[in-house]
């Protein structure tokens, strides 16, 4: 996080020299940075703000000496995957294991502080959320008689299943044919259900999961058991997302929104693994701010 602030926090556009090869090919120019390709190991430090290379797959001839020389001269050398993460908020799944996408060990301070904030914020919000939940339950029951709560087995931290609670937003027979993704115009969703899904009100009962320690306010969204089995087989590194406690909201939710198929889930995973790799109180605060914007706009809901 702080590296990205130092590199891209200034007003001037950063100019980076790119050594060809490996994941450096995935870099694209933005309003914050431009790249100059170098097919030969000659770089003038005054012309660029740093050097970018795939340190695991770099041309041998001359380039290692070039990086060492410029590093000693004070010119920063960045791994191409780091620059990609800074600019996109995602990790490159193809190199996730090599670059430790499972993240660094969480410090006791972060774990305890986050857990304390989870409990404190849930309890502090009850005077507002309890009346809202009662009204929501009444609206669901009036429109579609039946259980107002929906409990579904999801996969949590360490791959352990737990019963996640939501307000029921679909017909009572919505999953008679098994688990399936929700479409944008899904006929199974009730009118009240569409409203509470748009503004994420259906997630409020998960405060109970948070108090029990099964979930956090912030983390990768817990997925259904059948989908986890499918994605573990189809998507490389998918299991890494279970190395932290799942959340009611998360980096993937505010940056990518709902995923309705395997391709979208793969893209969403790249955001989840970014959070796993970089989770911190600062990133959590940013996610809270973006979640408020998401709720107000209804971004990514289905």
Task: Annotate each predicted stretch with a short phrase.
Residues 2-130:
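N-terminal hydrophobic signal-anchor/signal peptide
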Residues 14-34, 147-170, 190, 195:
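Membrane-cytosol interface motif
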Residues 84, 90-91, 150-188, 249-268:
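Short, glycine-rich, amphipathic interfacial segments at transmembrane boundaries or analogous
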Residues 96-103, 120, 175-177, 186-191, ...:
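Bateman (tandem CBS) regulatory domains
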Residues 110-175, 209, 281, 286-302:
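A hydrophobic, helix-centered structural microdomain
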Residues 118, 202-203, 272, 284:
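Acidic active-site catalytic centers that drive phospho-/nucleotidyl reactions
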Residues 183-245, 287-291, 295:
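A short, structured surface patch at a secondary-structure boundary
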Residues 235-302:
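C-terminal terminal-structure detector
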């Amino acid at each position: 996080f702080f590296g990205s602030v130092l590199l891209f926090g200034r007003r001037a556009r950063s100019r980076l020299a790119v050594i060809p090869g490996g994941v450096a090919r995935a870099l694209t120019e933005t309003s914050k940075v431009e790249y100059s390709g170098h097919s030969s190991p000659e770089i003038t430090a005054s012309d660029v703000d740093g050097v970018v290379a795939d340190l695991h797959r770099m041309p041998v001839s001359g380039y290692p000496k070039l990086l060492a020389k410029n590093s000693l001269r004070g010119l920063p050398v960045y791994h191409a995957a780091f620059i990609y993460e800074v600019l996109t908020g995602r990790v490159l799944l193809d190199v996730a294991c090599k670059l430790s996408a499972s993240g660094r060990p969480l410090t006791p301070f972060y774990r305890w502080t986050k857990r304390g904030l989870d409990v404190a914020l849930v309890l502090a919000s009850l005077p507002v959320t309890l009346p809202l939940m009662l009204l929501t339950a009444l609206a669901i029951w009036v429109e579609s008689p039946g259980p107002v709560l929906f409990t579904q087995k999801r996969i949590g931290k360490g791959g352990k299943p737990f019963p996640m609670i939501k307000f029921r937003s679909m017909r009572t027979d919505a999953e008679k044919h098994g688990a399936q993704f929700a479409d944008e115009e899904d006929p199974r969703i009730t009118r009240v259900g569409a409203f509470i899904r748009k503004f994420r009100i259906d997630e409020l009962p998960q405060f109970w999961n948070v108090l029990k320690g099964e979930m956090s306010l912030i983390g990768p969204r817990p997925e259904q058991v059948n989908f986890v089995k499918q994605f573990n087989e189809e998507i490389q590194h998918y299991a890494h997302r279970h190395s932290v406690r799942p959340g009611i909201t998360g980096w993937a939710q505010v940056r990518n929104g709902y995923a309705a198929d395997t391709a979208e889930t793969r893209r969403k995973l790249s955001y989840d693994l970014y959070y796993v790799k970089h989770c911190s109180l600062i990133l959590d605060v940013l996610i809270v701010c973006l979640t408020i914007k998401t709720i107000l706009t209804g971004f990514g809901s289905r």
